[in-house]
């Protein structure tokens, strides 16, 4: 049987707040090291 690939991208989080995005990533991948970077337009 094929190995289950760990989730590594969250395109659905575009437009969310950093807090919302971080919470969702940690739900999907509890061992993730989530780093929030500032974005300047």
Curated annotation (Swiss-Prot):
Q: Classify the source by domain of life.
A: Eukaryota
Q: Which InterPro entries match?
A: Prot_inh_pot1 (IPR000864), Prot_inh_pot1_sf (IPR036354)
Q: Which Pfam families match?
A: potato_inhibit (PF00280)
Disulphide connectivity of cysteines: none
User: Which keywords fit this entry according to its UniProt record?
Assistant: Protease inhibitor, Serine protease inhibitor
Q: Which GO terms describe its biological process?
A: response to wounding
The record's GO molecular-function terms, alphabetically, read: serine-type endopeptidase inhibitor activity
* Function recorded in the entry: Inhibits chymotrypsin.
Q: Which family does it belong to?
A: Belongs to the protease inhibitor I13 (potato type I serine protease inhibitor) family.
Name of the protein in its database record = Chymotrypsin inhibitor
Report the source organism: Eisenia hortensis (European nightcrawler)
Q: Which taxonomic lineage is given here?
A: Eukaryota, Metazoa, Spiralia, Lophotrochozoa, Annelida
